[in-house]
Amino acid sequence: GRCIEHMFDVGSGPVTIAYQPSFDDLGMPLSEVTFCVLDLETTGGSAATCEITEVGAARYRMGEELGAFQTLVNPGVALPPFITVLTGITQAMVVEAPRIEAVLPALIEFIGDAVVVGHNLRFDLSFLDAAARRLGYPKVSNRTLDTVALARRLVRPEVRNLKLSTLAGHFRSPVTPNHRALDDARATAYVLWGLLERAGGLGVTALEDLLQLPTARGSAHYRKIALADDLPRRPGVYM
């Protein structure tokens, strides 16, 4: 949260009163935010040496899907066998697919000015930024939200790890992550809704505060989270 200071002259000299404004005073209500949840499949783990094989994205507002974007991408290189085993994407599936040169501008248009969300989003953005740099496009400059970082803050004690499959199960996502881009993007969206519900319980109702939440140590929100971390996680009587 941010502290706003007002100075008042009460006769004996100026007095500064600091107060914490409500979330509604601070920015865009989450109910008005458009999120674009993104997932990429690639030939490997490094954007410096590997290529994109599939793009999946879906736009949401207030939990409703507004549109989806999905395409295989011809990486221009042979797919490593372990990638085919992991994703089910074969060389035959991508050989007739468009190249990233055709996909990237369409994806940028689809994302628009939405808040970009992903699970370990830095990985996906590293590939998009590498492609943009190579093709002469600006890097993605939208506001971003990583569900890994948000889950680490809000639900880490409740789950065995922060993998997408674990969190999707925790929040009862009807879409099972399967290393295909659009399904993984939609599963990430269900994780996001679960995390937004938790954040709402801490009083977070505006986008700006949500974006600060993963790193907002020392804030009122953080103190609430720290207190919540001390509470038992299972029903029953605790002495």
Q: What spans do the regions from the language model cover?
A:
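Conserved non-catalytic scaffold segment of RNase H-like nuclease domains
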Residues: 6-142, 157-179
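Active-site catalytic microenvironments for nucleophilic, acid-base chemistry
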Residues: 131-134, 153, 170, 191-198
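Conserved beta-strand -> loop -> alpha-helix junction used to position metal-binding or nucleic-acid-contacting
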Residues: 138-152
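Residues on a specific face of well-ordered alpha-helices
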Residues: 149, 162-166, 186-190
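Conserved phosphate/pyrophosphate-binding and hydrolysis machinery centered on Walker-type P-loop NTPases
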Residues: 181-185
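GIY-YIG nuclease catalytic motif and its immediate N-terminal context
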Residues: 186-239
